[in-house]
């Protein structure tokens, strides 16, 4: 990946011209490397469900963004999710920061496969 590409991916969620969806959901792409991407989210009241923990939709969205960004480090074309599933192993804390790390596991033809792990502070 070129440095220009790296900067473009990092700036996609921050600063002028940032993707509105990521900004609205408080997500920032904080690191990218060939086949990996890190997305962070400082939890806000609108990120939480009625039990005070991060809403499952927030976690799913973070996973999708991190996985897609990881694929974009290897491909120059637009990517989109064909299929996705998630397993919630435990509830995240309702304060602090969440970190999602997307990793490409396999690419070929027009498809790529990735996984994302999300952790709280």
Per-range role (PLM):
Residues 1-121:
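Terminal targeting signals and extreme-terminal segments of soluble enzymes
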């Amino acid at each position: 990946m070129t440095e220009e590409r790296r900067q473009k991916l990092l700036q996609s969620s921050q600063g002028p011209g940032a993707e509105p969806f990521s900004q609205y959901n408080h997500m920032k792409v904080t690191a990218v490397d060939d086949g990996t991407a890190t997305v962070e989210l400082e939890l806000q009241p609108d990120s939480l469900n009625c039990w005070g923990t991060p809403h499952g939709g927030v976690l799913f969205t973070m996973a999708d963004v991190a996985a897609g960004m990881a694929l974009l480090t290897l491909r120059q074309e637009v990517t989109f999710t064909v299929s996705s599933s998630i397993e919630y192993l435990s509830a995240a804390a309702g304060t602090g920061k969440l970190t999602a790390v997307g990793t490409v596991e396999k690419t070929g033809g027009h498809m790529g496969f990735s996984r994302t792990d999300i952790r709280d502070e």
